UniProtKB/Swiss-Prot annotation:
Protein's recorded name: Astacin-like peptidase p18
The EC number(s) this enzyme carries: 3.4.24.-
Cofactor entry: Zn(2+)
GO biological process: proteolysis
Role this protein plays: Active against casein. Has a role as a digestive enzyme.
Length: 20
């Protein structure tokens, strides 16, 4: 549910994460 280079919005909000 996260795109490399973008922010992980679920379940977190505006958290810089790089997950597949």
């Amino acid at each position: 549910n996260a795109i490399p280079g973008n922010y992980y919005r679920w379940p977190y909000a505006k958290v810089p994460y790089v997950i597949d």
